[in-house]
């Protein structure tokens, strides 16, 4: 499968792409194993019910990973170099939540081949769980 991303000349302000995924128990277990983040807030219900969130939550970086899928696969897509990302975690993500990551082009810097993309993750209720901005270099 040969995939080609959008060049800066093929992008426009306001252009959007999304990726949606339901977060599973396996996602949390695998992320914990890969990242080493085995905080009991993610794995132990007894522990987690006494925390601020009153129950287990998924790792915030799982939602950030969905942003990476938007940028690397959908827009700009294959060939994109992910340069930077700001993130604000605004609400918890729980196992079973369906998260939609959206990237929206907000600024283009053609002379540097850079694109600033607003990044937002929402859950199935429309609650914004993660928000930030990415700077990428789209493929040539």
Report residues per predicted region:
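Ser/Thr-centric signal marking residues that sit
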Residues: 18, 22-24, 63, 98, ...
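HotDog/MaoC-like acyl-thioester-processing domains
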Residues: 2-13, 93-140
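Proline-rich low-complexity regions
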Residues: 40, 76, 92, 138-139
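Hydrophobic beta-strand-centered segment that forms part of the acyl-chain substrate-binding groove
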Residues: 50-58, 64-105
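Generic structural detector for well-ordered beta-strands
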Residues: 18-22, 88, 104, 135-137
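Catalytic strand-loop segment that frames the active site of acyl-thioester-processing enzymes
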Residues: 2-58
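Short, intrinsically disordered, mixed-charge
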Residues: 33-36, 72-76, 124
């Amino acid at each position: 499968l040969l995939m080609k991303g959008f060049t800066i000349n093929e992008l426009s302000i306001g252009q959007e792409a999304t990726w949606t995924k339901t977060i599973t128990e396996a996602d949390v277990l695998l992320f914990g194993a890969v990242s080493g983040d085995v905080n009991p807030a993610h794995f132990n219900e007894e522990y987690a019910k006494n925390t601020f969130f009153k129950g287990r939550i998924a790792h915030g970086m799982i939602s950030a990973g969905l942003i990476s899928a938007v940028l690397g696969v959908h827009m700009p897509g294959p060939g994109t170099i992910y340069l930077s990302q700001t993130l604000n975690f605004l609400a918890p993500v729980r196992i079973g939540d369906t998260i939609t990551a959206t990237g929206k082009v907000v600024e283009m810097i053609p002379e540097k081949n850079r694109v600033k993309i607003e990044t937002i993750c929402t859950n199935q209720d429309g609650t914004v769980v993660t928000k930030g901005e990415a700077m990428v270099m789209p493929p040539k």
